[in-house]
Amino acid sequence: MATPMHRLIARRQAEANKQHVRCQKCLEFGHWTYECKGKRKYLHRPSRTAELKKALKEKENRLLQQSMGETNTERKTKKKRRPKSVTSTSSSDSSASESSSESETSASSSSEDSDADGSLSSSSSSSAYSSSSSSSSSSSSSSSDSDSSSSSSSSSSSESSSDDEPPKKRKKK
C-alpha cells in the first residue's frame, strides 16, 4: 500500500540516485534511459567474435613460435648427433673389416704353424679382435637407434600432413 508519502520518498531517492546513474542511450550522467531525450551516441567497439578471433590467432601464433623453437633446437641437436654417429659407424665398420681380415690371416698362419703355442697365440689374438668388433658393433647399433628415432619423427610429420589431406578431399565433393 503505497501512500503518497511513500511515493514522495521513493521519488526523492530516485532523484538522488540519478546523479550517479549513466544513461545507456546518450551515455551521460543525471537521468535514466527512459527519460532520455537525446540521440544515441555511436561508440565504436569491436564485436565479441572479432575479439575471440584475435585471441585465437594470437594463441596459434604462440604455439607455432614455440613449436618452431623446439624444432630448431631438435634440428641443432640432431645435426650435432649425426656427425658423431656417422664417424662412429664408419670407424666401427673399418675396425670390423680390419679385425675380420686379421683373423683370416691369423687363422691361415695358425694352420701353417704346426706348433701348439703358435695356434694358441693366434687364437687369443683373434678372440681379442672379435671382442673389440662386438663392442664397436654395439656402438653402431646405438647410433642406428638414434637414426631410427629421427626417421620415426620425420615419418610422423609426414603422417600428420597426410592427415590433413582427407578433409580436403571431402571439401571437393
Curated annotation (Swiss-Prot):
The keyword Nucleotidyltransferase does not apply. Signal peptide: none annotated. Keywords: Metal-binding, Zinc, Zinc-finger. Residues 57-173 are annotated as: Disordered. InterPro entries: ZCCHC10 (IPR039715), Znf_CCHC_sf (IPR036875). GO terms for molecular function: nucleic acid binding; zinc ion binding. It comes from the Eukaryota. The keyword Zinc-finger applies. A zinc finger (CCHC-type) spans 21-38. Residues 88-160 have a biased composition (Low complexity). This is Zinc finger CCHC domain-containing protein 10. It comes from Rattus norvegicus (Rat).
